[in-house]
Amino acid sequence: MRTRIGLIYSNPSAAYLSEFLLGSLEQSSLSGCQLVIEQCGGVESEREAIQRLAKGGVNGVILPAPLCDSRESLTAVEEAGLPAVLVASGRPAAGHCAVSINDFEASRAMTRHLLGLGHRRIAFINGHPNQTASGQRFRGFIEGMTEAGLSVDTDQVAQGYFTYRSGLEAAEKLLDTFHPTAIFASNDDMAAATMAVTHRKGLDVPGDVSVAGFDDTPLATTVWPELTTVRQPIAEMAREAVRLLIEQIRGRRGRAASQVVHRLQKFTLVKRDSTAQVKPFAAEKPTTRSKGKS
């Protein structure tokens, strides 16, 4: 009998989603499985989407972010009696297999990179508060700053939601109040928005403000200058999730005791043109400039 895998998504980032779907489809095809894709959101709840997948005869479900952290999704999967693999959760729920990177270490590595360029006035745009990866990335930023003997004040952290629009609002606030020499955004969408706001204010990236992101989606090489970011191997994480779910399904069919497995993928710090050495004295001088003036 051909294995059927369900994938349910509600990620607002088109760049992230396209890579994830591509990896899932490729591995499903290689494994001879049928991939059934469902979107939730709007009028349909996560529970309803998962119930429809279960009624359609899927043998297991993949839950990428943000659904991997949703109690509604996890409860629906458990009630349906389906094995699930959580992808990109910063703190995977007990009893479920997962694929992720070490968000804490990745964020700390990026913070260290900015510090190594001489930046001290580093601002941070956090991700959606309901996603556990956001908390891990924020912790990594705090740890990196603490290692350098620097405290983090509330005015150098802005709340985002992993969307371009939230990045615009967060960057506007940070540039107007904290005057950073570098901004580290929790994903590439918000980093791209930060660059747009910076340019609009007549500031140069990276001459006046360095900007860094997270994920290394195709957007990172579409913006100008190209974005320094953390590469999260999104497509490979999706492929690994399919492989892991197939193992779980086959184990159940063979009545083998299923093991909870958490597979960590490697992240990479990708240094491009949006970050540079801080200008002399810039760490102590507010970054302001009227648009159109040099």
Report each predicted region and the residues it spans:
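Short acidic/polar active-site loop segments enriched in Thr and Asp
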Residues: 59, 120-121, 180-181
